[in-house]
């Protein structure tokens, strides 16, 4: 689903779509094997990936670009948190290098896309 307009719904925002994929990837590895039994790490990383998604949705309903960008920055921080936590999963051999690379890169892509959207909002008066 590639939608170029974002006025109608948070689901239209490409950054949210990427964060959703990040969350899907995180859950796919976190709910299996030894990773699933490491409740602390599993809960932290699934919450962080979900937060990347949910903050975009929450900010979308804000009343101003400034408020929206605040939540978008929270989303970016959550992406960075996933990147840090996925190192722990790799170091504990819960995941393969290939899985690490996919999740790390998805978090980086999401972070960058959300950053571009922040710049757009800061330079566009009332885009909605």
Map each language-model feature to its residues.
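Short, C-terminally biased terminal segments at protein or domain edges
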Residues: 1-128
